Amino acid sequence: VLTRRLERALICADNARVVNVSSKVHSIVKKLDFASLRKPTKSLSGINEYAVSKLANILFTSELHRRYASLGISSFAIHPGLVDTEIWRTLPFFLRPILKLKGMLTPEEGAKNVLQCAFVDASTYSGKYFSKCTPSSPSTLATDQELAIKLWEQSESWMNHYSE
């Protein structure tokens, strides 16, 4: 929504960039069910919903690139790494040490990974997915161009519906 609201400013700017924060967890999504996106969740952990949102960020990045690269807008999706933030606050206490062993990043280190996309070569990497500062391959579902178009169009429809 924010990117679409800033569309005119992005088009007018020199070398505009949109960086969407994603996550490797997007890869657990096997199918994107648009009907379920409008229903209240029954999930207790929220992990599936989080994964879907991160998949959507990658698909949006790809479609933004396809639609706007010729107008000078670059787009990137990045998994910053496993960052030690409040997102883990609902994780059972006994599991937290396991995450620490996996090498959690400080928020500053995670932000550094995100900021890197502000400086990479846009002509080479726009529309791409990064994992911890490195261009990476997202899941097969995240590279489905038809799904990216469908998500874009559905999102436009929902935004129009709710902004009336």
Where on the chain are the PLM-derived regions?
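Surface-exposed helix-capping loop/turn segments at secondary-structure junctions
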Residues: 68-72, 124, 160-164
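Hydrophobic positions on the long internal alpha-helix
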Residues: 1-6, 10, 60-61, 117
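Non-catalytic terminal and boundary segments that flank Rossmann-like NAD(P)-dependent oxidoreductase
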Residues: 27-31, 141, 146-164
